[in-house]
A protein has these predicted regions:
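Secretory/organelle targeting and membrane-embedding segments
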Residues: 1-128, 133-297
Length: 297
């Protein structure tokens, strides 16, 4: 998914900032894989334009030139046999390879199987998957079953990038490192909790992905569920990952399921209309670029 929105907004800027901070090994290499047929020079030029729009800080020219020396591009159609044959030649079985799947969830299984068929998983390797993992309980189980065939559980990283936001990380500190707040964080002092995620952007050219996945899968069952758990969980035994996870699981198990027959009583859904953000006119959902007849009407 190297040419996708997530890569341009989050992944490459993060790698660039790590490089700028001197936190990447000198011999680390980045293989960007996407479906678009283009030269590595064209990919680098387009990536710089995108990153300059999305990054808050100015891009240092010296760091950029160092960064692109690490960066190669491979055009590959994941559904075609030998899609990753070219990638295999870039890998070193004596070093750890990290595969980051910034793609729609429908491609996760296919990509894992292709990587295996093209012998890209023969050395030590890890895999990172962005949410949502699957589009239903059934497809999520299928993805996890496939992952288990090719990777050890400790080498699988299921990522929710909201957890990396500073405000979200500070929730743990606010709740459990502040004795005054911690002692008042209960039903006798808190009447109710509302979690609002107000976005400044729409789908921005991601119609093909977004209208098929929908807001519930894209935001609620991952980002907002994680926020809910951080707000409602009991103090963990420690701030280690496993202890925090165990307390989150207790919250998820305690939630009251919404019965399909009563969805309309508990859920309000809609599509945003035309409006103005920061003084700029923005289109409504059904006027966005790439709009077809809405699958989520």
């Amino acid at each position: 998914g190297a040419t996708g929105d997530l890569s341009a907004r989050k992944l490459f800027p993060a790698l660039f900032q790590l490089d700028a901070a001197g936190l990447l090994q000198d011999d680390l290499r980045i293989a960007a894989v996407g479906r678009q047929q283009q030269t590595v020079e064209a990919f680098r030029d387009e990536l710089r334009l995108k990153m300059s729009r999305y990054m808050r800080q100015e891009m240092n020219t010296e760091v950029w030139h160092r960064f692109i020396e690490r960066l190669d591009y491979l055009a590959a159609d994941f559904a075609e046999p030998r899609a990753f044959g070219g990638l295999r030649g870039w890998l070193d079985d004596g070093r750890v390879s990290l595969f980051y799947l910034a793609t729609p969830p429908s491609l996760f299984t296919t990509i894992c199987e292709q990587l295996n068929d093209d012998r890209c998983l023969t050395g030590p390797c890890r895999i990172v998957l962005e949410k949502p993992i699957g589009e239903s309980l059934e497809t999520s189980s299928e993805v996890n079953e496939t992952l288990g065939r090719f990777f050890a559980e400790q080498d699988i990283y299921r990522i929710d990038h909201y957890l990396g936001k500073e405000t979200v990380q500070n929730l743990l500190v606010l709740r459990f490192a502040n004795r005054f707040v911690n002692s008042q964080w209960d039903q006798s002092c808190i009447d109710h909790v509302q979690i609002t995620v107000a976005e400044k952007v729409g789908i921005e050219g991601r119609w093909a992905y977004y209208d098929g996945v929908g807001q519930l899968r894209d935001m609620v069952q991952n980002h907002l569920m994680q926020l809910l758990c951080l707000v409602a969980m009991e103090p963990p035994n420690s701030l280690e990952a496993e202890s925090i996870r165990d307390e989150k699981v207790k919250i998820v198990k305690a939630l009251r399921p919404v019965d399909p027959a009563t969805v309309k009583e508990h859920v309000v859904r809609g599509q945003y209309s035309q409006g103005v953000i920061n003084g700029q006119a923005v289109p409504g959902y059904l006027e966005e670029e790439g709009c077809a007849t809405s699958a989520s009407d």
